[in-house]
């Protein structure tokens, strides 16, 4: 019976820290979603899904494709306004950090052949065409004033603690203190990037 009360007390402590972290994690996700919408609409307008998700999915195997998550979480119905609301945090990770190219190999080859046929293939044009095949992530392309490597590291830590909180796992005082700082830093970076777009500093 004594052991039972000890376990019960520790469960209460873990629950306390989880409840304290949950609003901050929710705030992080909300601000992240706002930043992504803002950056994608600014760069791609209403075609942002075809310009990003479709190209990212090309790099992923069938079980990890983002559109599969969207279809499952939205009961088969989503649009440009609601798509991100159906993302899980792990989906955001794939969306932000998976590297993809703007054009397929077939497009690149066809473009080179067309330039060659029209006798306009020089070193500059060849370099320009090939550069379009370079793979870059959403974070690298569109998220302003944020170092991709640093943000990816912070994101992984938030994903880890988020899973512990959501699944009722042990959350200690050390977890709470460390991740409060991680989340605060991440939110600050996101807000700074949003401010760039709000002020049209791009």
Region locations from a protein language model:
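Amphipathic alpha-helical interface elements
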Residues: 1-160, 164-202
């Amino acid at each position: 019976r004594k052991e039972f009360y000890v376990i019960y007390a520790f469960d209460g402590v873990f629950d306390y820290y989880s409840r304290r972290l949950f609003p901050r994690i929710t705030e992080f996700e909300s601000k992240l979603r706002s930043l992504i919408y803002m950056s994608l609409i600014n760069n791609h307008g209403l075609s942002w899904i075809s310009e990003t998700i479709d190209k990212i999915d090309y790099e992923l195997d069938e079980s990890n494709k983002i559109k599969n998550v969207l279809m499952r979480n939205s009961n088969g119905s989503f649009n440009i306004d609601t798509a991100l609301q159906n993302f899980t945090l792990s989906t955001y990770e794939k969306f932000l950090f998976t590297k993809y190219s703007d054009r397929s190999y077939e497009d690149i080859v066809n473009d080179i052949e067309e330039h060659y046929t029209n006798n306009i293939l020089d070193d500059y044009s060849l370099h320009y065409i090939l550069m379009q095949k370079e793979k870059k992530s959403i974070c690298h392309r569109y998220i302003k004033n944020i170092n991709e490597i640093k943000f990816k590291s912070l994101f992984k830590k938030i994903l880890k603690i988020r899973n512990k909180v959501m699944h009722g796992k042990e959350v200690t005082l050390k977890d709470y203190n460390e991740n409060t700082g991680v989340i605060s830093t991440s939110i600050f970076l996101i807000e700074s990037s949003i401010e760039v777009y709000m002020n049209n500093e791009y």
